[in-house]
């Protein structure tokens, strides 16, 4: 059955609506050209998620065992969701909230995704602060994390291998003496060296520098998280100043910056890759990363982590893709862009993974450790421990490579957070048309800076883990399920495919139809249910959070997930049509605002939809298979 917008349709109202949509279209800026859109999508999807999060996620899930589930998830969930969000943004020329004129009762999905995006922004900026800090100290005559201080117990220099080997030999010969010092806070971290039946805990100087000099990590936050570090606070402030300058003029400024944000990181990443694969032991690390462990394919946790990483890397379910696509021309060829970005994202993740595991292989070789998993703990500190450690081993001007690397990380982070921040600014500006874009950008940037202060405290990494787990991961996950259900199951796959055909002038393939209607939602639902049933109290650095932390985490998740039903009820209460049940049913139909923003294009679309409905009516009458034929065509969204 063809869905029709609800509400009155008299000529006067139609004329007024046409004028409003035309005015809205005129007010909305478009990209300078299609390449700016592509570069912007690359800058957000090919970001810290590839260089920072993908390697340590693969590390936590057995290296190569993670690659097969990740690639399968990419094709059955990642690509379909990415393409769907691109279509929604370009078709409506609206942001994350306004697109829900397709199914007004689901408007809470947009607000919930905005909440999840704010959570991600809050800690993402702290990562930028860390990269800036490392960038600044890289200009010293000797990299400060490359050598051990006198008061650093059981420390191994991150200098070239010949120095490290001599140090380990000395440690091994005096293991009994060092064993008495294992009561220090460092004994819970690092790697072990077995000699004379005594286990000596070793740490690279890069790890100690990060944990005890930079973030001044607390191993227990039961007494609080401490005060913000003033150096990291200044770095955080500088990061937000840059973010504001990039987004202050909307796509006019961010589109131009996207060329640099998208392309420069690849130059540095290739340089680091070449250096990493030439290090001793790199081969073992790469083999560990690429060699699949087939038994892990049956581990549901690995599949759940693959979905989470796919969402994080592609920025699916948090709004940037919809927001970017909303600034496109209606006839822009987004299919090509979607395929380019999703493919490039995967290749970059593999490139980043090979680079980091080559470095881990070298680290294991220098520390005489057989199991690469024992080299360094995983987590957010991986990029600030293993990468700096490798850079310290560069024979020629390591300071130069360090500056290039951390500048690359900063550029990657800026590209990601600019997209996330622009999503929030676009939502606010779409809701309140009278507000100046730059003022909203300034206000949200100030709020982002204040929220980021929590993460530059000694207990900040604990809070980052908590917010990422409850506010970023699970909120985005569950709302993505509702997003797909509202578009494909409520609005209807057949209607959606017709809209794509009208906009892109191409039929939707069976691959997309099967993924959207069955494989993608079913896999997401199964994985989400499993993850909720088997969920355990989260840990940081192998330590459990205090009870108050878990309560705060579930409260964070509850606030994000509750946006969906609460805003749905709000819409129903504001648009009553008869009984409560009738109002709910009406809220699940497209509103008058659904469709292309341009009035002329919208009229053409309505004619196209009417013609499609007439064609299907004729086909149903002529079909000999009757009921079953109609079910097949409705399921596939195709005029077979």
From Swiss-Prot:
Cellular compartment(s): Membrane
GO cellular component: plasma membrane
GO BP terms: amino acid import across plasma membrane; D-amino acid transport; neutral amino acid transport; sodium ion transport
CDD domains reported for this sequence: SLC6sbd (cd10324)
Biased composition (Low complexity): 1-13
PROSITE patterns: NA_NEUROTRAN_SYMP_1, NA_NEUROTRAN_SYMP_3
Entry's family note: Belongs to the sodium:neurotransmitter symporter (SNF) (TC 2.A.22) family.
Protein name: Sodium-dependent nutrient amino acid transporter 1
Originating organism: Drosophila ananassae (Fruit fly)
Gene from which the chain derives: NAAT1
